[in-house]
Amino acid sequence: MPSLLIGTSGWAYANWKGPFYPEDCPRRRYLEYYAQEFPTTEVNSSFYHLPRAATYEQWTAQVPPEFVFALKVSRLITHHKRLVDVEEPWRAFVDRARVLGRHLGPLLLQFPPSFRCDRPRLARFLASACRPAASDPPLRLVCEFRHESWFTGDVYDLLQRHGAALCIADSPRYPRRDVRTAEFVYVRFHGRTQMFASSYTDEELTKEARWLKRAAQDGHDLYVYFNNDARGHAVENAWTLRRLMEGRRRKKTQRAGGV
């Protein structure tokens, strides 16, 4: 049965105290509390620096066995080197990521909007990155392109050949293409009218739920993350979409204020 994992991009937001976290919840327990509400999160800090192994170990100690961390790949790989001569930093990133063990989810490669399509370069990277050591479980890779030139049939075919997913990213700033290229679907909701700041309406989320249900019926695992973290919109929208997808009520929890 396909997995349905809906969560938010990150959890350590100070302005979520009150709207989401109880007022008496210390910051060190945010993840533990978050993991009672959601089955997954997308880690953004890994984009800026390589987390320590001890950090990953601390995280896994705070979440249930089935909890999943999706990791945003280092900007050294996607922005600075732009997939050129990245064998060493890629291996370092992946080796560290595997400390998460069963909790490791997809790895998101978010490319800058100034990075135009270079299919041969992407092909060389995927050929190497999607070939793990025999003893390692396969990785789920996701590509979020932000330049229009990447959205072509040739690029989709390349992703499909390597089992990598095209990130379906909803935002007011960058192109969106609802194209499935892998056995799983990866969606990022950045905010429809304001990047990172606007909330989705119930009507908008109902429409999104329809096509996501079709993807699930086709056997695709679903990873869905809300990146509109301002004022707690992400948690509200994540719960609404989950309710629409699963036909369930939100579970009752003790908290100061409601989301």
Indicate residue ranges for each PLM-predicted region.
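Residues lining hydrophobic/aromatic ligand-binding pockets adjacent to catalytic sites
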Residues: M1-V259
